[in-house]
UniProtKB/Swiss-Prot annotation:
The lineage of its organism: Bacteria, Bacillati, Cyanobacteriota, Cyanophyceae, Synechococcales. Keywords: Isoprene biosynthesis, Manganese, Metal-binding, NADP, Oxidoreductase. Pathway: Isoprenoid biosynthesis; isopentenyl diphosphate biosynthesis via DXP pathway; isopentenyl diphosphate from 1-deoxy-D-xylulose 5-phosphate: step 1/6. GO terms for molecular function: 1-deoxy-D-xylulose-5-phosphate reductoisomerase activity; manganese ion binding; NADPH binding. Inhibited by fosmidomycin. It comes from Synechococcus sp. (strain ATCC 27144 / PCC 6301 / SAUG 1402/1). Its cofactor is Mg(2+); Mn(2+). NADPH binds at T10, G11, S12, I13, G36, R37, N38, N124, E126, G215. It catalyses: 2-C-methyl-D-erythritol 4-phosphate + NADP(+) = 1-deoxy-D-xylulose 5-phosphate + NADPH + H(+). This is 1-deoxy-D-xylulose 5-phosphate reductoisomerase.
Amino acid sequence: MKAVTLLGSTGSIGTQTLDILEQYPDRFRLVGLAAGRNVALLSEQIRRHRPEIVAIQDAAQLSELQAAIADLDNPPLILTGEAGVTEVARYGDAEIVVTGIVGCAGLLPTIAAIEAGKDIALANKETLIAAGPVVLPLLQKHGVTITPADSEHSAIFQCIQGLSTHADFRPAQVVAGLRRILLTASGGAFRDWPVERLSQVTVADALKHPNWSMGRKITVDSATLMNKGLEVIEAHYLFGLDYDYIDIVIHPQSIIHSLIELEDTSVLAQLGWPDMRLPLLYALSWPDRLSTQWSALDLVKAGSLEFREPDHAKYPCMDLAYAAGRKGGTMPAVLNAANEQAVALFLEEQIHFSDIPRLIERACDRHQTEWQQQPSLDDILAYDAWARQFVQASYQSLESVV
């Protein structure tokens, strides 16, 4: 039985992970939970799954959480704040930590789990995007395995299983025989919109993802295609390929989750209904596969599978991500932080949808003079904070988009 800790338990990744643990009580045991501020859902999860330790990021919610579970026998230890979440990440006999915290907030807890020798089911892509130069050496130092828990990188990970033994996979090392990675993208909420309409986008429009049920931030990232750009950087760190050999293709049906091209031009793909539980389950169970009762893919029902080249004019965030990835060093951290802040401003209706890439580009351009090739963790955290402050301070000076 594998002992599991879950970070970000009240979010989309977290609730689906708990569904999996509940379906396989003989395979997984929950050790710890960490969440942001959703006391109602967290208290329900505590009652249902009985973790040993819990952290709530928002310390102001502590008394309410304690009151909500006051009648429990043997209640869990409850911690608060970033320090509490980090302590949960490194706590006890958990063998694997699912990192479902959205954004760069998941970075320090993930590093704490790695330093405690715990394997990582990586749903928080920002860990590698912002801090790949720091995280990759830590994985090797502590002998930790990282398994991707998002659909695209899980698809690639599954496809390369036939190219090497399980012991051969090491992040950032190219698997023998692998030539190219093709990341599929749904195209998000605006894949069928003309570029001219994007200046009219509302928050409600951007949150209407055609295929996946996800959190607000990642749904906006899907609409800008920044999500796919960030996944390109993550794929570079996970699988070691140069950016010239990592491509994006629009696949509206979201049935093929990604593909790999081999040296002999053969192409392998992983297919399935758009269901986040599939990559989460494999990240937890790897190298084993567990039987499920979930709906199997019916190719006849799926019908036609389409592919399109992404429109660079519609999705400028994609090119910004490639440029930041190629620059490396601290630039991906600045890109990621600027995007998080810009998306937050958009969700608060402080900026237009089309302002998101403009703010990100401004931050990356300004960072050129301060860029570092071999940053420390402190450097990455400092530039992450700088990029957020820069976007917050500069958004009001944007000229209106006509």
